[in-house]
Regions:
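Serine-hydrolase catalytic machinery in alpha/beta-hydrolase-like enzymes
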Residues: 2-87
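Active-site signature of alpha/beta-hydrolase-fold catalytic machinery across serine-
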Residues: 29, 105-109
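Flexible "cap/lid" loop of the alpha/beta hydrolase fold
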Residues: 52-60, 122-139
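Gly/Ala-rich beta-loop-alpha elbow adjacent to hydrolase catalytic centers
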Residues: 94-99, 103
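A conserved short beta-strand
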Residues: 112-124
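C-terminal catalytic histidine-bearing segment of alpha/beta-hydrolase fold enzymes
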Residues: 139, 155, 168-200
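Short beta-strand/loop motif that positions the catalytic acidic residue
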Residues: 139-146
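Conserved alpha/beta-hydrolase "acid-adjacent" motif
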Residues: 147-154
Length: 200
């Protein structure tokens, strides 16, 4: 996978997954918001180019192209296995929209890849059910006025995942659209800092 790496001064790693049409530099501003001392691994989606770039093929009639989705999840897991992540004491995956959906797919395969997951504006797609991980902390965020996300379906999915796989998952709702508002960024930063302080 193509990626951009920034070496930090702390034993923390942020892994960024951009939204549709983004690239490996689209989410670097979040390092400034979250943790300037952390190292960053920011990934390029492997499907499409330019405004179409994403982490997996577009939906077909609202459903995942499961063959493509599984192939790209497997490719990421192979890539991740080859990385030297031993120096990092805290790993946080952060995804927006398509990138958050991709992370949700990863959670159905290996729910222990990271310590924390920040899923910004994901969708309730036809994912397989995740394996249990009572340790991982997951923050889902939702823009109540987002045109691309069914808020009720996402609330139901988060409730199911919380009850059966990730008891430390929670959903934060914002009265905005499909973008990161300042209120949301502040909330996410505080959530992340609380978990960083716990590790200190």
């Amino acid at each position: 996978m193509d990626y951009y790496f920034i070496k930090g001064t702390s034993p923390r790693l942020l892994v960024f997954f951009h939204g549709t049409g983004g690239n490996k530099k689209s989410m670097l501003f979040l390092r400034q918001q979250l943790d300037l001392e952390a190292s960053v691994l920011s990934l390029d989606g492997s499907w499409g180019q330019g405004r179409d770039r994403r982490f997996f093929a577009p939906l077909i009639d609202g459903q995942l192209d499961l063959v493509d989705f599984e192939k790209r999840l497997s490719a990421f897991l192979d890539f991740w296995q080859d990385l030297d992540i031993q120096p990092y004491q805290q790993i946080t995956f952060v995804g927006f929209s398509n990138g958050a959906n991709f992370i949700m797919g990863l959670l159905t395969k290996q729910p222990n890849l990271a310590d924390n997951y920040i899923l910004l504006h994901p969708s309730a797609l036809d994912y397989a059910f995740p394996l249990e991980n009572s340790r991982a902390e997951i923050l889902f965020t939702l823009g109540q006025n987002a045109p691309y996300v069914d808020p009720v379906a996402l609330e139901n999915l988060v409730g199911d995942w919380q009850a059966l796989a990730f008891p430390r998952a929670n959903l934060a709702r914002f009265d905005k659209g499909h973008f990161l508002s300042q209120d949301e960024l502040t909330y996410v930063r505080n959530w992340y800092q609380e978990r960083t302080d716990k590790k200190a």
